[in-house]
Protein backbone atom coordinates (compact mmCIF):
# COMPACT_ATOMS: atom_id res chain seq x y z
CA UNK A 1 0.00 0.00 0.00
CA UNK A 2 1.45 3.38 -0.94
CA UNK A 3 1.72 6.31 1.49
CA UNK A 4 -1.40 8.09 0.25
CA UNK A 5 -3.52 4.92 0.44
CA UNK A 6 -2.23 4.35 3.98
CA UNK A 7 -3.18 7.90 5.02
CA UNK A 8 -6.66 7.52 3.48
CA UNK A 9 -7.21 4.24 5.37
CA UNK A 10 -6.01 5.73 8.70
CA UNK A 11 -8.33 8.70 8.20
CA UNK A 12 -11.24 6.38 7.32
CA UNK A 13 -10.69 4.37 10.53
CA UNK A 14 -10.95 7.42 12.80
CA UNK A 15 -13.54 9.42 10.85
CA UNK A 16 -16.11 6.72 10.05
CA UNK A 17 -17.27 6.28 13.68
CA UNK A 18 -17.71 10.08 14.05
CA UNK A 19 -20.00 10.49 11.03
CA UNK A 20 -23.43 9.38 12.20
CA UNK A 21 -26.85 9.17 10.57
CA UNK A 22 -28.31 10.91 8.67
CA UNK A 23 -24.81 11.55 7.27
CA UNK A 24 -22.93 9.01 5.18
CA UNK A 25 -19.19 8.92 4.50
CA UNK A 26 -18.95 8.60 0.71
CA UNK A 27 -15.23 8.88 0.00
CA UNK A 28 -11.87 10.22 1.19
CA UNK A 29 -9.16 11.63 -1.06
CA UNK A 30 -5.74 13.00 -0.17
CA UNK A 31 -3.53 14.69 -2.72
CA UNK A 32 -1.85 17.79 -4.05
CA UNK A 33 -3.89 20.55 -5.66
CA UNK A 34 -1.57 23.25 -6.90
CA UNK A 35 1.07 23.58 -4.20
CA UNK A 36 -1.25 22.55 -1.35
CA UNK A 37 -2.03 19.14 0.13
CA UNK A 38 -5.80 18.66 0.50
CA UNK A 39 -7.62 16.05 2.58
CA UNK A 40 -11.11 15.86 1.07
CA UNK A 41 -13.81 14.03 2.99
CA UNK A 42 -16.97 13.53 0.94
CA UNK A 43 -20.14 13.32 3.03
CA UNK A 44 -23.79 13.21 2.03
CA UNK A 45 -27.25 12.74 3.50
CA UNK A 46 -30.55 11.90 1.80
CA UNK A 47 -31.67 15.51 1.31
CA UNK A 48 -28.14 16.75 0.51
CA UNK A 49 -25.71 18.55 2.81
CA UNK A 50 -25.76 22.26 3.58
CA UNK A 51 -22.97 24.73 4.26
CA UNK A 52 -23.87 24.57 7.97
CA UNK A 53 -23.55 20.76 7.82
CA UNK A 54 -20.03 21.03 6.41
CA UNK A 55 -19.06 23.52 9.13
CA UNK A 56 -20.48 21.26 11.88
CA UNK A 57 -18.77 18.19 10.41
CA UNK A 58 -15.45 20.06 10.17
CA UNK A 59 -15.69 20.91 13.89
CA UNK A 60 -16.35 17.23 14.69
CA UNK A 61 -13.75 15.70 12.35
CA UNK A 62 -10.77 18.06 12.71
CA UNK A 63 -10.03 17.25 16.39
CA UNK A 64 -10.35 13.51 15.67
CA UNK A 65 -7.72 13.75 12.92
CA UNK A 66 -5.36 15.36 15.44
CA UNK A 67 -5.55 12.21 17.59
CA UNK A 68 -3.88 9.97 14.97
CA UNK A 69 -0.46 9.01 16.37
CA UNK A 70 2.10 9.10 14.96
CA UNK A 71 0.98 11.94 12.71
CA UNK A 72 0.66 10.30 9.25
CA UNK A 73 0.67 13.56 7.30
CA UNK A 74 4.13 14.38 5.90
CA UNK A 75 3.26 18.08 5.59
CA UNK A 76 0.53 20.55 6.47
CA UNK A 77 -2.78 20.01 4.69
CA UNK A 78 -6.13 21.69 4.24
CA UNK A 79 -9.21 19.80 5.44
CA UNK A 80 -12.15 19.97 3.05
CA UNK A 81 -15.54 18.54 4.00
CA UNK A 82 -17.66 18.48 0.89
CA UNK A 83 -20.60 16.95 -0.94
CA UNK A 84 -19.87 14.25 -3.51
CA UNK A 85 -21.80 16.34 -6.04
CA UNK A 86 -23.91 15.24 -8.97
CA UNK A 87 -21.32 12.73 -10.18
CA UNK A 88 -21.04 10.88 -6.89
CA UNK A 89 -18.61 7.93 -6.96
CA UNK A 90 -20.10 4.45 -6.53
CA UNK A 91 -17.29 2.73 -4.63
CA UNK A 92 -19.14 -0.16 -2.99
CA UNK A 93 -21.64 -2.81 -4.02
CA UNK A 94 -24.23 -1.11 -1.79
CA UNK A 95 -23.65 2.19 -3.59
CA UNK A 96 -24.08 0.48 -6.98
CA UNK A 97 -27.26 -1.26 -5.78
CA UNK A 98 -28.59 2.11 -4.62
CA UNK A 99 -28.04 3.52 -8.12
CA UNK A 100 -30.43 1.12 -9.89
CA UNK A 101 -32.67 3.20 -12.16
CA UNK A 102 -30.13 6.02 -12.36
CA UNK A 103 -27.83 7.20 -15.15
CA UNK A 104 -24.26 6.08 -14.44
CA UNK A 105 -20.75 6.05 -15.92
CA UNK A 106 -18.73 2.82 -15.64
CA UNK A 107 -15.06 2.27 -16.52
CA UNK A 108 -13.80 -1.29 -16.92
CA UNK A 109 -10.49 -3.08 -16.38
CA UNK A 110 -11.17 -5.15 -19.49
CA UNK A 111 -13.26 -4.38 -22.59
CA UNK A 112 -16.71 -5.85 -23.21
CA UNK A 113 -17.82 -5.71 -26.86
CA UNK A 114 -14.65 -3.68 -27.57
CA UNK A 115 -15.68 -0.99 -25.05
CA UNK A 116 -14.05 -0.10 -21.73
CA UNK A 117 -16.46 2.73 -20.84
CA UNK A 118 -20.25 2.60 -20.65
CA UNK A 119 -22.65 5.39 -19.81
CA UNK A 120 -26.34 4.65 -19.45
CA UNK A 121 -29.14 3.63 -17.12
CA UNK A 122 -28.39 0.95 -14.54
CA UNK A 123 -31.35 -1.42 -14.95
CA UNK A 124 -30.32 -3.97 -12.31
CA UNK A 125 -27.52 -5.09 -10.01
CA UNK A 126 -27.95 -8.74 -9.08
CA UNK A 127 -25.53 -11.53 -8.26
CA UNK A 128 -22.50 -9.25 -8.73
CA UNK A 129 -23.55 -8.23 -12.24
CA UNK A 130 -24.64 -4.82 -13.52
CA UNK A 131 -27.24 -4.66 -16.28
CA UNK A 132 -27.06 -1.37 -18.15
CA UNK A 133 -28.98 0.16 -21.02
CA UNK A 134 -26.88 2.51 -23.15
CA UNK A 135 -26.97 4.20 -26.55
CA UNK A 136 -24.73 2.84 -29.30
CA UNK A 137 -24.96 5.64 -31.85
CA UNK A 138 -28.76 5.73 -32.36
CA UNK A 139 -29.68 2.28 -30.97
CA UNK A 140 -30.45 1.31 -27.40
CA UNK A 141 -28.42 -1.69 -26.24
CA UNK A 142 -28.18 -3.67 -23.04
CA UNK A 143 -24.94 -4.97 -21.55
CA UNK A 144 -24.18 -7.28 -18.61
CA UNK A 145 -21.05 -6.24 -16.71
CA UNK A 146 -19.48 -8.43 -14.01
CA UNK A 147 -18.79 -6.28 -10.94
CA UNK A 148 -15.23 -7.67 -10.85
CA UNK A 149 -14.48 -5.86 -14.15
CA UNK A 150 -15.55 -2.43 -12.85
CA UNK A 151 -12.55 -0.18 -12.25
CA UNK A 152 -14.58 2.97 -11.55
CA UNK A 153 -18.26 3.80 -11.35
CA UNK A 154 -20.09 7.04 -10.64
CA UNK A 155 -23.41 8.73 -11.13
CA UNK A 156 -23.46 10.71 -14.37
CA UNK A 157 -25.34 13.72 -15.64
CA UNK A 158 -27.33 12.95 -18.79
CA UNK A 159 -27.03 15.81 -21.26
Swiss-Prot record:
It comes from the Bacteria. GO terms for biological process: ribosomal small subunit assembly; translation. The keyword Cytoplasm applies. GO terms for cellular component: cytosol. It is found in: Cytoplasm. HAMAP family: RimP. Required for maturation of 30S ribosomal subunits. This is Ribosome maturation factor RimP. It comes from Streptococcus pneumoniae (strain CGSP14). The lineage of its organism: Bacteria, Bacillati, Bacillota, Bacilli, Lactobacillales. The gene is rimP.
Amino acid sequence: MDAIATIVELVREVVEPVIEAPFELVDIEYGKIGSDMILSIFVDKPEGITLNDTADLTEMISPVLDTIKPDPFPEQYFLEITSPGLERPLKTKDAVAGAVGKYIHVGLYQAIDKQKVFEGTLLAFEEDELTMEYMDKTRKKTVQIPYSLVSKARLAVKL
